[in-house]
Swiss-Prot record:
Protein EC: 4.2.1.59
Protein's UniProt name: 3-hydroxyacyl-[acyl-carrier-protein] dehydratase FabZ
Organism ancestry: Bacteria, Bacillati, Bacillota, Bacillota incertae sedis, Caldicellulosiruptorales
Catalytic activity: a (3R)-hydroxyacyl-[ACP] = a (2E)-enoyl-[ACP] + H2O
Gene Ontology biological process: fatty acid biosynthetic process; lipid A biosynthetic process
Stored InterPro entries: FabA_FabZ (IPR013114), FabZ (IPR010084), HotDog_dom_sf (IPR029069)
Active site: 48
GO MF assignments: (3R)-hydroxyacyl-[acyl-carrier-protein] dehydratase activity
Its job: Involved in unsaturated fatty acids biosynthesis. Catalyzes the dehydration of short chain beta-hydroxyacyl-ACPs and long chain saturated and unsaturated beta-hydroxyacyl-ACPs.
Organism in which the protein naturally occurs: Caldicellulosiruptor bescii (strain ATCC BAA-1888 / DSM 6725 / KCTC 15123 / Z-1320) (Anaerocellum thermophilum)
Amino acid sequence: MYNIDKILEIIPHRYPFLLVDRIIEVEEGKRAKGIKNVTINEPFFQGHFPSNPVMPGVLIVEAMAQVGAVAMLLKEEFKGKTPFFAGIDKVRFKKVVKPGDVLVIETELISLKGSIGKAKAVAMVDGEVVCEGELLFAIK
């Protein structure tokens, strides 16, 4: 398990764009499972939406990517590098994510050619899928 201090050593993301709080399982270069505690203090809730706060879907996708980035950046050849989105495929949002929810995010590498790869990812709240899809990335 990796706490926030270890996560900050691995990925380059920082507040307010760090969207993973803990890694609870990881296989270097293959898969990771992480947690995002969603609180009303998140800056995006000020405008999305003030009377009905909902986590923006694009930030759920970003959280999934950051969990995957932890697994990939543990590989020796990628340590200290920066992961970039190259695309997203088959992403579906199934339920809204609200303050107080705990996102449990799982990512698994599907393919990797050099520094370009694809992963499948799923985000769940209380065991129910809220978002799933495929993430394409490049590591530079």
